[in-house]
Curated annotation (Swiss-Prot):
Name under which the protein is recorded: 28S rRNA (cytosine(4447)-C(5))-methyltransferase
Enzyme class, first EC level, given as a word: transferase
Binding site for S-adenosyl-L-methionine: C392, C393, A394, P395, G396, G397, K398, D416, D443, D460
Record has Cytoplasm as a keyword: no
Keyword Repeat: no
Chain positions covered by the region annotation Disordered: 1-211, 591-812
Polar residues bias locations: 591-608, 660-682, 723-739, 803-812
Family annotation (InterPro entries): MeTrfase_RsmB-F_NOP2_cat (IPR049560), MeTrfase_RsmB-F_NOP2_dom (IPR001678), NOP2_rpt (IPR012586), Nop2p (IPR011023), RCMT (IPR023267), RCMT_NOP2 (IPR023273), RsmB-like_ferredoxin (IPR054728), RsmB/NOL1/NOP2-like_CS (IPR018314)
The organism of origin for this protein: Homo sapiens (Human)
Classification lineage: Eukaryota, Metazoa, Chordata, Craniata, Vertebrata
Modified residues (N6-acetyllysine): K649
Length: 812
């Protein structure tokens, strides 16, 4: 029952097996009862197609050579189609097709019938569908009859290419001179099928109003009982929904808050919900809430739940990034360049092979390294033929990066305090082909005692790890305030030690980079601000064109304004581990004197020794306090007189000259120790040296040690009444003075300005002569620890004098 095949004819429409045999409609007429036009039964798809074809025939008649009066005979119309409907089609055009009694659906265009006509004309066959009384109809009678529903389903399968039928319909309408838009046709169908007063649009409006009411309903904090239930057995979906609601309320707190609720209540509820949903401890979550805004805080917590992408750094000592990328792609690795800021980085999305065990990795062509750990080396910018220190080098990623930037020239000293981690450094440096590195194992805080004078120093200080939570989720709960402060104190010590290791006079360097993988202010800005106060360094730009600026003010703290040049990196904004980078420039190798000796975290080196700077005490204290101090020291002199007597006996000084010893300052152990503790205190009473005056109080307090000659001498030379009788500061000679020998007497008493050199007559050493010799103007004098000494004449001018029967050398 197939049709003839013409190989030159292009096939159109569905296949020939999808069409039904012609003439089935005539058989249906025999089985179906006749119905009137008012109550017409729904036509089959085939009958509708033929009816539409006949209606369109009258429209297309003028363009064809057919007679315009040719109309289908009324007697041959199928049942269900009236002659009036067919006649109106030629008068009103295609719009009458929609007004014909066709049931609920508009008849499809006669695209398939046109194809059937063309096929029948080519095959020379008679279209039995147009002949209702054909003799072949008896041969095609179905024993079981035909069901219109089954015909509709089969015809639907034959009309799958809807676009093709619509295109043909538009072509026919254009040929008839009528232009119809698809929107107008659809609107007419909707008007026929659903009236404007029907229910579905009202239902949609009702749904929309309900949705608006749900959106406008304010959020209400749950009661205490529900909060306790969430703490015991939390419903994560409900907790997450509550987090979103609270964050939305806090953005517009004045308009959306619940009456009688304060902002602190919402914040406390949010903090508890975040701790439950993301499994954070209260301490660390509180630190993060102080650090980020609420909307950014949720993004940061979400980013910590996702691991950072795997990144690797190309070893330019052995290969190029282009060659390495091609080799890894051939092995099934999906990768891309890391970014415009890196010339050697690659980011790996997925891999069919272990990325850490490829032949390229074993050959040292690349190093698995995080993107954030490449930034400190780029900020340091090491140059060729320099001396560089990596104070905390393990596991060797930054050290090898510096070596490849230096092209294996110069010297790199890689130091780490952990001997076990140094093993990985050795392995990586050998694999990557680094040859300019020396590995050391010292405590970084004591490193300036070992070696110094480096051009550049890199300090990747140990920290709490709050920036790498995605790698170590245990940080969420095992950190507290003590851990943060302990790390901060260690970082201060290491940073001062690193600064002392830098050579400020370096022609190409003098730079230091300090970095941590933490985001807390206590470990970053606080430490940097401390170093700016303790050492002669300043902050310089890091050279990185991205990253957020460091804090210059955080809560109650205020930092140096130059901290804006530091850089912060976060996982939710830069898709890398949290990191902090600061770059210093050292401009002097000296240490500020104001910070010397009283720094708790200063590195104990030889440059930290205190310097003794003499300064007059009377310039800073009133005269009354000076007199009181002098009297107190006179009482001490009383108890130390036996030492004075032994000193006189050792140095051959007569008892008559005992009073002159009161004008000589001595440095005791207490005074020496105080000078090292506070350099602002003077070493001795300078004013007492300039104006030595002795009153009768000394003779009354120590009568046993004074001879009768001394008493008479003091009475004769006592100053008149009314003059200044201030007692100078008198201290007993120390043990060091007592051990001095007479041969040291040739050294001068002190290089004070205005000291007159006079020769004394050949007589015993008297008090008046000594006072006249040491009558110096007021002014600061350096401390002295020597006994009575003056300028010594040449040996030829030495004279002898008798004192109590003993020969003694007099100083002229």
């Amino acid at each position: 029952m197939g049709r003839k095949l013409d190989p030159t004819k292009e096939k159109r429409g569905p296949g020939r097996k999808a069409r039904k045999q012609k003439g089935a409609e005539t058989e249906l007429v025999r089985f179906l009862p006749a119905v009137s036009d008012e109550n017409s039964k729904r036509l089959s798809s085939r009958a509708r197609k033929r009816a539409a074809k006949r209606r369109l025939g009258s429209v297309e008649a003028p363009k064809t050579n057919k007679s315009p009066e040719a109309k289908p005979l009324p007697g041959k119309l199928p049942k269900g189609i009236s002659a009036g409907a067919v006649q109106t089609a030629g008068k009103k055009g295609p719009q009458s097709l929609f007004n014909a009694p066709r049931g609920k659906k508009r008849p499809a265009p006669g695209s398939d019938e046109e194809e059937e006509e063309e096929d029948s004309e080519e095959d020379g066959m008679v279209n039995h569908g147009d002949l209702w009384g054909s003799e072949d109809d008896a041969d095609t009678v179905d024993d079981y009859g035909a069901d219109s529903n089954s015909e509709d389903e089969e015809e639907g399968e034959a009309l799958l290419p809807i676009e093709r039928a619509a295109r043909k319909q538009k072509a026919r309408e254009a040929a008839a001179g009528i232009q119809w838009s698809e929107e107008e046709t659809e609107d007419e169908e909707e008007e026929k099928e659903v009236t404007p007063e029907s229910g579905p649009p009202k239902v949609e409006e009702a749904d929309g109003g309900l949705q608006i009411n749900v959106d406008e309903e304010p959020f209400v904090l749950p009661p205490a009982g529900e909060m306790e239930q969430d703490a015991q057995a939390p419903d994560l979906q409900r907790v997450h929904k509550r987090i979103q609601d609270i964050v939305g309320i806090l953005r517009d707190f004045g308009a959306q808050r619940e009456e009688g609720r304060s902002r602190s209540e919402y914040l406390n509820r949010l903090k508890k919900d975040l701790a439950i949903y993301y499994s954070y401890g209260d301490f660390l979550l509180g630190k993060l809430m102080d650090l980020f805004p609420l909307s950014e805080l949720v993004e940061f917590l979400e980013a910590n739940e996702v691991p950072r992408p795997v990144t690797l750094r190309t070893n330019t000592l052995k290969t190029r990034r282009r060659d390495l990328a091609q080799a890894l792609i051939n092995r099934g690795v999906n990768l891309d360049p890391l970014g415009k800021w890196s010339k050697t980085g690659l980011v790996v999305y997925d891999s069919s092979v272990p990325i850490g065990a490829t032949p390229e990795y074993l050959a040292g062509h690349y190093m698995l390294q995080g993107a954030s750990s490449m930034l400190p080396v780029m900020a340091l910018a090491p140059q060729e033929h320099e001396r560089i220190l990596d104070m905390c080098c393990a596991p060797g990623g930054k050290t090898s990066y510096m070596a490849q930037l230096m092209k294996n020239t110069g010297v790199i000293l890689a130091n780490d305090a952990n001997a076990e981690r140094l093993k990985s450094v050795v392995g990586n440096l050998h694999r990557l082909g680094v040859t300019n590195t020396i590995i050391s194992h010292y405590d970084g805080r004591q490193f300036p005692k070992v070696v110094g004078g480096f051009d550049r120093v890199l300090l990747d200080a140990p920290c709490s790890g709050t920036g790498v939570i995605s790698k170590d989720p245990a940080v969420k709960t095992n950190k507290d305030e003590k851990d943060i402060l302990r790390c901060a104190h260690l970082q201060k010590e290491l940073l001062l030690s690193a600064i002392d290791s830098v050579n400020a006079t370096s022609k190409t360097g003098g730079y230091l980079v300090y970095c941590t993988c933490s985001i807390t202010v206590e470990e970053n800005e606080w430490v940097v601000d401390y170093a700016l106060k303790k050492r002669n360094v300043r902050l310089v730009p890091t050279g990185l064109d991205f990253g957020q600026e460091g804090f210059t003010r955080f809560r109650e703290r205020r930092f140096h304004p130059s901290l804006r040049s530091t850089r912060r990196f976060y996982p939710h904004t830069h898709n890398m581990d949290g990191f902090f980078i600061a770059k210093f420039k050292k401009f002097s190798n000296s240490i500020p004197q104001s910070q010397t000796g009283n720094s708790e975290t200063a590195t104990p080196t030889n440059v930290d020794l205190p310097q003794v700077i003499p300064k007059s005490e009377n310039s800073s204290q009133p005269a009354k306090k000076a007199k009181g101090a002098a009297k107190t020291k006179q009482q001490l002199q009383k108890q130390q007189h036996p030492k004075k007597a032994s000193f006189q006996k050792l140095n051959g000084i007569s008892k008559g000259a005992d009073s002159e010893l009161s004008t000589v300052p001595s440095v005791t152990k207490t005074q020496a120790s105080s000078s090292f503790q506070d350099s602002s205190q003077p070493a001795g009473k300078a004013e007492g040296i300039r104006e030595p005056k002795v009153t009768g109080k000394l003779k009354q307090r120590s009568p046993k040690l004074q001879s009768s000659k001394k008493v008479a001498f003091l009475r004769q030379n006592a100053p008149p009444k009314g003059t200044d009788t201030q007692t100078p500061a008198v201290l007993s000679p120390s043990k060091t003075q007592a051990t001095l020998k007479p041969k040291d007497h040739h050294q001068p008493l002190g290089r004070a300005k205005g000291v007159e050199k006079q020769q004394l007559p050949e007589q015993p050493f008297e008090k008046a002569a000594f006072q006249k010799q040491n009558d110096t103007p007021k002014g600061p004098q350096p401390p002295t620890v020597s006994p009575i000494r003056s300028s010594r004449p040449p040996p030829a001018k030495r004279k002898k004098s008798q004192s109590r029967g003993n020969s003694q050398l007099l100083l002229s």
